[in-house]
Design a protein with these regions (language model features):
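Surface-exposed beta-strand/loop patches in extracellular or lumenal glycoproteins
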Residues: 172-186
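Solvent-exposed beta-hairpin/edge-strand motifs
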Residues: 182-198
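Active-site core of glycosidic bond-cleaving carbohydrate-active enzymes
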Residues: 1-125, 165-167
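Short, well-ordered beta-strand segments enriched in hydrophobic/aromatic residues
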Residues: 156, 166-173
């Protein structure tokens, strides 16, 4: 599975190949066996948005047992937890740590889940940029947008409405490289405009539906369907986290228990 992520040797275009089918098939094991493993990213790289979301939820709800990222020590707990001489043997005796009842998963949860979501929104590992390549069906009625970096030194933004339709794509060129974008509207004709003056940019469309256009360093471009208007900037707001007040039991309540 590493051939899809992190190696990036195959992707959505290889989904129907023998190797691609093998990777997709390996994602079908027991839902609760992924632990903190990059299954969300692997699933997204193969265009399996529903599977990616499933493993993200599973990692948070099942494997990561506590809000701060702690999980139970499943290597001998609770048999050896009270043995002061007990150690956890890692990397074949090259890394020994004292046994604890809890383990901190470190950066794994955050990096896995955040990177997984990023890969669901944007991919650029196949020599081209894809926007919304692996959005799960559960999000089809949710408007969404992102701004992420893509390979080739491009800052890419894109928005999608509540009908699961891409409304427009924005590209800021940081190094003036050739931009190759998978047409997010399939075989529909689209155009590229330079934001500074609204001038149309020459675009070449390949047989694989990839739009290729030259860029200049620091310039911003909008990719849109022909006949549609460029959308104005939209600010998205989220609801603040709900604060819950927990009170400790009184000494009297403790005595009763």
């Amino acid at each position: 599975q590493a051939v899809a992520f992190p190696a990036g040797l195959i992707g959505i275009d290889d989904k129907d190949t023998r190797l691609g089918k093998a990777v997709v098939n390996l994602l079908k094991h027991d839902d609760e066996c992924n632990a903190h493993y990059p299954y969300p990213q692997i699933a997204a790289r193969m265009g399996e948005g529903d599977v990616a979301l499933k493993y993200i939820w599973n990692g948070v709800n099942v494997h990561q047992m506590y809000p701060q990222g702690l999980m139970h020590n499943v290597t001998g707990y609770p048999d050896n937890i009270y043995d002061l001489a007990s150690v956890h043997n890692l990397l074949k005796d090259t890394y020994m740590i004292r046994s604890h009842d809890f383990f901190q998963c470190g950066m794994e949860p955050m990096s896995n889940y955040c990177t997984g979501i990023n890969e669901m929104m944007l991919q650029s590992n196949e020599g081209k940029i894809r926007v919304f390549p692996a959005v799960p069906a559960a999000w089809d009625s949710i408007p969404m947008a992102f701004i992420l970096l893509a390979r080739g030194a491009f800052l890419v933004s894109a928005s999608r409405n509540n009908s699961a339709e891409v409304t427009q794509v924005g590209v800021k060129s940081l190094k003036g490289n050739l931009c190759r974008l998978q047409n997010p509207w399939g075989d529909k004709k689209c155009e590229v405009l330079r934001c500074r003056d609204g001038r149309k940019v020459s675009v070449k469309t390949g047989g694989d539906g990839v739009l290729a256009f030259s860029t200049q360093t620091g310039e911003e471009y909008v990719v849109r369907l022909i006949g549609t208007e460029t959308l104005v900037k939209e600010v998205y707001f989220g609801k603040p986290n709900i604060c819950l007040l927990y009170t400790s039991p009184s000494p009297r309540d403790t005595e009763r228990s």
